[in-house]
């Protein structure tokens, strides 16, 4: 059993922290910007509530965070009352935020200078994956810290991979989002085409999902897409944040991402339709408007 802090109890962090407490059996202290959410978590799962990230992190073996973006991450780590000020030497900070590789490298350097380790460890699997404890975790950082943290991360994961040095976890998550963007647009166009052709979409998917076109998105989203229901997953506002990170990194490393850039604009169109909180499969709604 380890002593653990978790910073950020959103739709992902709330169940992830719960798995660390209930499945992992760890002592968990939580911090959330909206205190009422942390109070609810403690009432539901036990553990302790801390008023600041610094208070949460003090003396802990492992500190996790799952927050909104680079600025939020800097705030809970190196900002006023940030966790880095109180972390003990030899501890490991594991960040599950989808953020830039740049901020991951920056925080890795600051952690090393202070005598503890930093792992960038974004996740894939959405809210359902977090609730069921079956997330995929893509990790960047030192192997020693990874092996130390892996048994703890395992409480909410089904796949944990060390992808390389600091920033590599975030870069891998970018590839994940780039791939998903193209897959969903292709699926949306396929369903749209099938409807226009007068085909039974259920029968079509039953057949093509067993061939080369099959994907997680097809298996898990075609029914809701066909029914015009878009409240079953990752919100478009967050997907556009992620794709913005991908496109910024591509500008830095010289990668050409024409489809990703186009799909990002398609998501912008869906936002303008009032779909900011619709899930990513709502690309079909744009085609059917």
Model-derived segments and spans:
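Rossmann-fold NAD(P) dinucleotide-binding segment
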Residues: 53-116
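Methionine-biased hydrophobic packing positions in alpha-helices, especially
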Residues: 12, 16, 66, 87, ...
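Helical "substrate-binding/catalytic lid" subdomain
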Residues: 167-289
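Rossmann-fold dinucleotide-binding core
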Residues: 4, 67, 93, 98-178
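Hydrophobic beta-strand scaffold residues
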Residues: 28, 49, 117-119, 160, ...
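Hydrophobic residues within alpha-helices
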Residues: 16-20, 107, 152, 193
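NAD(P)+-binding Rossmann beta1-loop-alpha1 motif at the extreme N-terminus of oxidoreductases
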Residues: 1-65, 91, 96-97, 127
